[in-house]
């Protein structure tokens, strides 16, 4: 019922992180014009890595194709025919996806296998300048390890809607202007709420 909302929120985080919109917005609201400080990156022509190729991952691929991107995905259980139909290259190794993708978006369930999957070791394999989006589940990414990778300049930025502990009012990511954060708003649209109500009533 909320797959469209969740997908659109992940795309919103990707776009706002790529163009540093919240940080730019904040400086202008402080009545300072700092145009030269905010040089973003384009999505056009880039490689997008989708981790978890279920309903939302597939929808994300479908939407991002409009930006003329190359899309790769990692999911051991992926529907190969659907991937081919969407023009998505499936990779068998998550490390390969991390080393090739300019943007990584996570669409995994939270399971014993996926908790902490994005640790310091995996993040070290990321392509330099990568942006990571997590609008799936909290706890899949080690937030401290990601904050360290961003501070070192290896990872450019991140967009996060979910956190290891929720409600979350303190994370190593909150101190970084390169990170865009929202309080688990993936399903928070009028339409998703309406559909959820209809589903319950049915």
Where do the protein language model's features map onto the residues?
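C-terminal helix-to-coil terminal segments
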Residues: 1-9, 39, 157, 162-202
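Phosphate-binding beta-alpha-beta segment of Rossmann-like dinucleotide-binding domains, i.e.
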Residues: 1-47, 59-62, 66
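Glycine-rich Rossmann-fold phosphate-binding loop(s) that bind the pyrophosphate
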Residues: 53-54
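Short, structured coil segments at secondary-structure junctions
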Residues: 67, 86-87, 175-177
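Short beta-strand "acidic-cap" motif of Rossmann-like dinucleotide-binding folds
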Residues: 71-73
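Rossmann-like adenosine-cofactor binding region
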Residues: 76-172, 188
């Amino acid at each position: 019922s909320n797959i469209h909302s969740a997908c659109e929120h992940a795309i919103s985080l990707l776009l706002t992180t790529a163009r540093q919109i919240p940080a730019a917005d904040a400086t202008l609201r402080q009545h300072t014009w700092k145009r030269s400080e905010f040089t973003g990156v384009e999505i056009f022509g880039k490689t997008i890595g989708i981790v978890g190729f279920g309903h939302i991952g597939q929808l994300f691929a479908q939407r991002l194709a409009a930006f003329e991107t190359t899309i790769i995905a990692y999911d051991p259980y992926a529907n190969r025919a659907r991937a081919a139909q969407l023009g998505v290259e499936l990779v068998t190794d998550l490390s390969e996806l991390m080393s090739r993708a300019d943007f990584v978006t996570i669409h995994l369930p939270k399971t014993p296998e996926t908790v902490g999957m994005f640790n310091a070791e995996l993040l070290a394999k990321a392509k330099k300048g990568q942006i990571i989006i997590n609008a799936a589940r909290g706890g899949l990414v080690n937030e401290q390890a990601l904050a360290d990778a961003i501070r070192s300049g290896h990872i450019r930025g991140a967009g996060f809607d979910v956190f290891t502990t929720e409600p979350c009012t303190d994370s190593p990511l909150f101190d970084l202007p390169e990170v865009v954060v929202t309080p688990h708003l993936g399903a928070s649209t009028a339409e998703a709420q309406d559909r959820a109500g209809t589903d319950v009533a049915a």
